């Protein structure tokens, strides 16, 4: 018995003082995903990549908004959302203490405004996504005077662009046909 007591005294404390002392986690620990709405462009890549369907994106045309929502009750902390985010708006934290008394506290939401088409006035994409695309194109072309033109092109929905292209193609085909006669 004394031998066992000596061994225990030499070994020291085997347990940690958690929750009274903070528990250290390893650097690669995958905890609660944290969204930075200021960086998010509401592209939906994270929702497509989430295998547990914990992330959802809902578009409301009536309110002209897109809502990003994370339900921590479904999250498996795989880190796919962090990997696919093009703007690094989602970061996995070291936070693992997710006990709540209210189920609503397990939800994280962010709302983003949608851009309306300059021709048909229907909402079609988040304003931040279009602004980022126009900015990236302007940087590649190194032409600040084209920014307004790029923004004008980016603020037209795909359906209106397609309609305009088809109309122009038909007109061009008719003009070529008349010239051949």
Swiss-Prot record:
[4Fe-4S] cluster 1 binds at residues 40, 43, 46, 50. PROSITE patterns: 4FE4S_FER_1, 4FE4S_FER_2. One of its GO terms (cellular component) is membrane. InterPro entries: 4Fe4S_Fe-S-bd, 4Fe4S_Fe_S_CS, NADH_quinone_OxRdtase_chainI. [4Fe-4S] cluster 2 binds at residues 75, 78, 81, 85. It holds the Pfam family Fer4_7. One of its GO terms (molecular function) is metal ion binding. Probable electron transfer protein for hydrogenase 4. PANTHER family: FORMATE HYDROGENLYASE SUBUNIT 6-RELATED, NADH DEHYDROGENASE UBIQUINONE IRON-SULFUR PROTEIN 8, MITOCHONDRIAL. This is Hydrogenase-4 component H.
